Amino acid sequence: KVGDIVSAETHIICGECEFCLRGEGHICENTKIIGVDTDGCFAEYVKIPAMNCFVNSKDANPLHLSVQEPLGNAVHTMGHFPIEGKDVVVVGCGPIGLMGVNVAKAYKAKK
C-alpha cells in the first residue's frame, strides 16, 4: 500500500509455463528481468507485480535494504556452483563482485 517500503524480486515469471505450473518459477522459460527485459528501477516510479514485492519493516534502515538485490546476485551465483574447498576468481570489483568475494568465503571457498 502507499507508504510501504518494499523490496522486489527482479525476475518476473510468467505463471503459465510448465515450470511455473509445477511451482518451479525459478526456472521459468519466459522470465523477464527488470532492467534487462523491461525498464529498470532508476526512476521515480516503477511498476512491479505485487507478487514480486515484499514489505519491509518500517524500522528497517533503507541503506541496509539497498544491498538486498546485489547481494542476492552474489549469493545466487556462488550458490550455483560447488565452490567449497576450491579457488574462486571474481572478475570485477563493483558492488556485486565485492559481495561475491565475501559470499565465496561464507561458502568456504579455499581462496
What are these regions (language model features)?
Residues K1-E18, S57-A60:
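Glycine-rich beta-strand-centered segment in the early N-terminal region that forms part
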Residues I12-N30:
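Local cysteine-cluster metal-coordination motifs and their immediate loop/turn environment
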Residues K1-S7, H26, A43-V46:
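Signature of N-terminal electron-transfer/Fe-S-associated modules in redox systems
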Residues E18-F19, D37-P49:
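A structural motif shared across PLP-dependent enzymes of the aminotransferase-like
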